[in-house]
Amino acid sequence: HFIKISISLGLSGVLHLVLIINFILDFEIFYEPRYVIPIAGMILANSMNVLSLAIERFDKELSRNESFESARKTSFKSALIPQINSLLAVGLVSLPGMMTGQILSGIDPLIAVRYQIMIMATILSSAGISLIIYFLLSKKN
């Protein structure tokens, strides 16, 4: 599992990090650690959680003699539930740390909300793509 997980997280994480840093945020110096480290940490940590949930569920489904496709579909859906629920709750039930920190530091709340939406969408996208890559690599074995 380790190689497939590493490839899945690496490809998805780097892809999303490059897209955000270069095209969405458009920083002058894209490799500056104060930008790259927190964004990469949020992307990779959440993708890792989703991937671990999916793999655990996938292995359970396969142990029940489910087909590869059925186990993949079930684990994909169940692993993304926490991410989708957190998207639904942002701003209504919970205020994420990044958004709260920006608001407390004096940033316009609308800008803070835009950044938070971007991060949440990126986390969901990165998690989904890392799952897709993992299952594509698993299918070949």
Can you name each region flagged by the protein language model?
Residues 117-139:
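Hydrophobic alpha-helical transmembrane segments of polytopic membrane proteins
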Residues 69-96:
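Transmembrane alpha-helices
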Residues 23-31, 62, 104, 108, ...:
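Membrane-interfacial segments
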Residues 7, 76, 114-121:
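Internal alpha-helical transmembrane segments of multi-pass membrane proteins, especially GPCRs
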Residues 16-21, 101, 127, 131, ...:
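Structural signal for membrane-spanning alpha-helices in multi-pass inner-membrane proteins
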Residues 37, 41-69, 133:
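Membrane-embedded alpha-helices of multi-pass transport/permease systems
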Residues 1-46:
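Loop-to-helix entry region at the N-terminal start of transmembrane alpha-helices
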Residues 92-114:
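Hydrophobic, glycine/alanine-rich multi-pass transmembrane helices and their short helix-loop junctions
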